[in-house]
Amino acid sequence: MSEMEKALILITLRLESSSNLVEQLRAIKGIKDAALIYGPYDAYATVETPDKEGLWHTLTKIRAIYGVHSTLTCNTVR
C-alpha cells in the first residue's frame, strides 16, 4: 500500500476574509487540522490525501474560499 500524500498549507488572507475561515477549512475533505496563526501567514491547514490528485483537489478548494489571497504548500518528505 502506498503512503498518503501529506502537506502543510500556509495561507495568506485578504482583509475582507471570512470570519469562519477555520470552520470552512475543517469542512474540506482531506484537511486534518486548521488554525489561525500570527506571523507572515495568517492560517495553516494540514492535509492528508491518498494521492497527489487528491492533494491538488483539496488545495483548489482552499483557494476557492472567500478571502484566501495565496497559499504555500509544504509537502512532507518522511
Each PLM stretch: what is its role?
Residues 1-78:
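A compositional/biophysical signature of low hydrophobicity enriched in polar/charged and small residues
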